[in-house]
C-alpha cells in the first residue's frame, strides 16, 4: 500500500519545479494521487477494511484542498497537473 522510496523519487522527479523541490503543491498532489490509487486497489480486495477507508477519505480531502489552493494560486499549473494525473474529465 505504501509507496516505496523509488516510486516516491520518480514521482518527485517528474513533478518538481526545481532541483531541490519536494514540497510544492504539484509534488504533494501527485504523491497523494498515487497513494490513493494504491489504497483504492487494496480496498477492492479487502472490502471490510474500514480503518484504511477512513485514511483514504482523509487523503482525498487533503488532495482536494491542495488542488483548490493550486487552482486559486495558478490556474495554468492546475490545468496542466490535472491533465498529467488524469484527474477530472
UniProtKB/Swiss-Prot annotation:
Gene: rpsO
UniProt xrefs under SUPFAM superfamilies: S15/NS1 RNA-binding domain
InterPro entries xrefs: Ribosomal_uS15 (IPR000589), Ribosomal_uS15_bac-type (IPR005290), uS15_NS1_RNA-bd_sf (IPR009068)
Assembly and oligomerization: Part of the 30S ribosomal subunit. Forms a bridge to the 50S subunit in the 70S ribosome, contacting the 23S rRNA.
Protein species of origin: Dictyoglomus turgidum (strain DSM 6724 / Z-1310)
Function comment: One of the primary rRNA binding proteins, it binds directly to 16S rRNA where it helps nucleate assembly of the platform of the 30S subunit by binding and bridging several RNA helices of the 16S rRNA. Forms an intersubunit bridge (bridge B4) with the 23S rRNA of the 50S subunit in the ribosome.
Source organism phylogeny: Bacteria, Pseudomonadati, Dictyoglomota, Dictyoglomia, Dictyoglomales
Segments passing through the bilayer: none
Keyword vocabulary terms for this entry: Ribonucleoprotein, Ribosomal protein, RNA-binding, rRNA-binding
GO MF entry, a single one: rRNA binding
Pfam family, one: Ribosomal_S15
Record's keyword annotation contains Metal-binding: no
A GO cellular-component term linked to this record: cytosolic small ribosomal subunit
Entry similarity comment: Belongs to the universal ribosomal protein uS15 family.
Protein name: Small ribosomal subunit protein uS15
Keyword Phosphoprotein: no
GO-annotated biological processes: translation
Amino acid at each position: 500500500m505504501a509507496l516505496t522510496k523509488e516510486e516516491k523519487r520518480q514521482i518527485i522527479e517528474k513533478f518538481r519545479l526545481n532541483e531541490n523541490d519536494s514540497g510544492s503543491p504539484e509534488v504533494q498532489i501527485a504523491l497523494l494521487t498515487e497513494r490513493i490509487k494504491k489504497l483504492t486497489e487494496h480496498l477492492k480486495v479487502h472490502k471490510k477494511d474500514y480503518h484504511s477507508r477512513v485514511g483514504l477519505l482523509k487523503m482525498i480531502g487533503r488532495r482536494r484542498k491542495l488542488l483548490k489552493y493550486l487552482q486559486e494560486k495558478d490556474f495554468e499549473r492546475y490545468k496542466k497537473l490535472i491533465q498529467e494525473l488524469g484527474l477530472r474529465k
